[in-house]
């Protein structure tokens, strides 16, 4: 990072568009997903941070309080996959976004979904503001797994990503993980982000790791949405196979989504429902860290990923990792855990058994993981990203 980067960033007025929902209650802003906490920290490096996204009219709070952050609401629609709702919301959204640009220097537009992302990017250029694109996922791959058989959505995703990649040749892009960096390698300028919510104080030392792999129970932990692209039903199969070899295994699942009932049914079908606890969504500061500390392994079975935040959290907790080799996962996990093919319960169960039985391998992996996560703390990632967003001095 340039020596003057922090000073430069401190005078930048930054707006961020992301296709997330927010709620406002009693004058306070609440965010739907923990990525917003990363954005909140990014605001510490700017003169002004303004978030813009869907205002959910449903009463109640989302889990994450966004203190000290300005908010410009956009019309609500249920999902970027519901194109009619997206298009109905677009005229009012365009007018609101145009007004937002009046007192802004830099705009980070995360996309390529929904279509508004591309429109907002073009409006930013028309208003002669600095535009930086942001990409967190392989959209066509995500749509293929989340909406199987819906070819029109997959084609729309291909078109949106193609337009984003074409625009990226003219403007800088910040992507999550090396896999997406490869897809956007022809961008005018490229920065790789690791979305981390970890402070240095969260990273355990070897002396603080008191896990007992000879205990009466072994707990595997899964953290993530229970949606098709995350492949949560495989967790039941992994648990069943692992328990055949070692009856001590139990499963903790943190996350909610469309496949929760299907996962419960699959656990019953395999006769392992009494070995599993489905906790629902557990906020970062609402008990999730304790579950990392109490677990013996993290199991991550997604079909598609950028760089999962949960892997960094497991690294910080010195929790051994078994993960599918998809997206940006191999680059992050290399030397820090075991990789398995997607949708292969036998391979995942075998990897769990290998790690339980090899103390030296576990120690090497968690030591490497601890060193790696120190490179990607929340403060470090936000400093680097803020400097990139601000642009050349």
Language-model segments: what does each one mean?
Residues 303:
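Aromatic "clamp/platform" in nucleotide-sugar-dependent glycosyltransferases that forms part
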Residues 311, 320-323:
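Short hydrophobic beta-strand element within catalytic cores of glycosyltransferases
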Residues 338-345, 354-359:
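Conserved acidic donor-binding segment of nucleotide-sugar-dependent glycosyltransferases
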Residues 54-55, 157-207:
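A short, active-site helix/loop in glycosyltransferases that binds the activated sugar's phosphate group
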Residues 218, 222-241, 258-264, 289, ...:
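A conserved mid-protein helix/loop that constitutes part of the nucleotide-sugar donor-binding site
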């Amino acid at each position: 990072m340039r020596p003057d980067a922090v000073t430069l960033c401190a005078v930048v007025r930054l707006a961020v568009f992301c296709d997330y929902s927010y709620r406002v209650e009693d004058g306070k802003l609440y965010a739907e997903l923990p990525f917003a906490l990363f954005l909140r920290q990014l605001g510490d490096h700017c003169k002004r941070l303004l978030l813009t996204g869907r205002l959910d009219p449903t009463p109640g709070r989302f889990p994450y309080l966004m203190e000290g952050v300005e908010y410009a609401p956009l019309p609500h629609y249920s999902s970027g996959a519901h194109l009619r709702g997206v298009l109905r919301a677009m005229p009012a959204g365009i007018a609101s976004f145009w007004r937002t640009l009046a007192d802004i220097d830099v705009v980070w537009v995360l996309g390529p979904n929904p279509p508004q992302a591309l429109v907002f990017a073009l409006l930013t250029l028309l208003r002669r503001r600095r535009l930086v694109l942001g990409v967190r996922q392989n959209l066509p791959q995500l749509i293929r797994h989340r909406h199987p058989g819906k070819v029109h959505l997959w084609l729309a995703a291909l078109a949106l990503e193609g337009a984003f990649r074409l625009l990226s040749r003219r403007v800088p892009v910040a992507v999550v993980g090396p896999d997406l960096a490869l897809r956007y390698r022809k961008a005018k300028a490229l920065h790789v982000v690791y979305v981390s919510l970890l402070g240095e104080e969260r990273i355990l030392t070897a002396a603080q790791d008191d896990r007992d792999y000879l205990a009466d129970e072994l707990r595997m932990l899964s953290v993530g949405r229970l949606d098709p692209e995350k492949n949560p039903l495989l967790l039941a199969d992994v648990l069943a196979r692992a328990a055949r070899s070692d009856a001590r295994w139990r499963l903790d699942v943190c996350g909610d989504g469309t496949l929760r009932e299907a996962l419960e049914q699959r656990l019953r079908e395999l006769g392992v429902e009494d070995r599993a606890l489905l906790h629902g969504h557990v906020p970062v500061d609402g008990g999730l860290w304790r579950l990392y500390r109490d677990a013996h392994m993290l199991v991550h079975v997604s079909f598609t990923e950028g760089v999962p935040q949960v892997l960094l959290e497991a690294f910080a907790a010195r929790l051994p990792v078994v993960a599918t080799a998809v997206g940006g996962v191999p680059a992050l996990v290399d030397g820090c855990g075991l990789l398995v093919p997607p949708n292969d319960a036998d391979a995942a169960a075998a990897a769990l058994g290998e790690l339980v039985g090899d103390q030296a391998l576990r120690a090497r992996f968690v030591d490497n993981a601890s060193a790696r996560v120190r490179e990607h703390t929340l403060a470090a990632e936000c400093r680097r990203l803020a400097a990139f967003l601000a642009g050349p001095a």
